[in-house]
Amino acid sequence: MDPLAFRLTNYAEVEPITGKPFSSKGLRECYARGAERFGWSKRPLQPRSTRDDAGLLVGWGVGTATFPALMFQAEARAVIRSDGSGAMEIGAHDMGQGAWTALPQIAADALGLDMAQLEFKSGTSDLPDGGIAGGSAHTATAGMAIHEAGAAVIARLAELATSDQRSPLFGSGNAGVVARGGRLWRRDDDTRSESFADILARAGLSQIDARGKGAADPAAQAAYAMHAHGAVFAEVKVDPDLCQVRVTRLVGAFACGRVINPRMVQSQIYGGMIWGLSFALQEEAVVDHRSGRTINANLGEYHIPVNADVPSLEALMIDEHDPHVNALGIKGVGEIGVTGSAGAVANAIWHATGVRPRRFPVRIEALLDGGPT
């Protein structure tokens, strides 16, 4: 049976363990988009049935990716100043994943400012706790704290304007205005607006501030299963005599909720796919069972890919709206790329050789022992 057809036949419409509905699940579209881009329809069913011009065995495999949409706790402080500019303060840190690009985008949107009007302060413990960067939860957690802080300070600003008879927004109510371009606008009348600077000047204030917290919604978590999903398709080539394996192509399609910065997300996904390839073929922690110590704790013996090991990569992002996971609709992308890639590589090795890998990393000796050339 075709592996993709097998997965679709056994597709889970609800979370199998709890029976909860998914808050959103774009996995079917991930399968469809990834398979189309990869050319999966041309895959022969029988293993060991394809060779390239050099006589290498060629195999195609697919793996399903999933990772829980987690949130921790964070806090942020938002400021609107009398010159119309704003600031967002949060002690979030960036380890290279692009947080200091994505989080200011969320902040600018929350405050209704252009990026040039925003001062983003981060990276120090003097600021409100930004939560941990881990578990594919940082953007959702810190982002929601920023979103809530922005909403709170805009609500304060709106109260100043809508309760003042001198304001063109008088009587609109907080829910009747929206922040955009450094101004508050009436939702029902685009001709009536007032700048942040004018509102604060009339109130005699140099600035206003507010705080917001980011955390998971217990009611939503109780009602829904929240996951990011994806599908990874792999092509490998195997030397029929030496059983050396080389991954030549990886195509992944992922449904991860709202994408804040497409370029950063794609970079995260690429890193995850490379990590999955490394997990499948190279990485292994060797432990001395007498002492419990790791005995290959160095890059000479713990092998990871170099540039020459990385194949052609392609990551497709599926547009997914999730109204339940959080107010921003964000799911994490830090690890979803890892979870399907190793399985896809192992399945491609089976398709190329007829030998089913049962242990990672897949060693040459396992293929030599498992079947003839």
Residue ranges with predicted function:
Residues 68-70, 84, 94, 242, ...:
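Residues that cap or initiate secondary-structure elements
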Residues 88-91, 330-332:
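A short, structure-level motif marking secondary-structure boundaries and short turns
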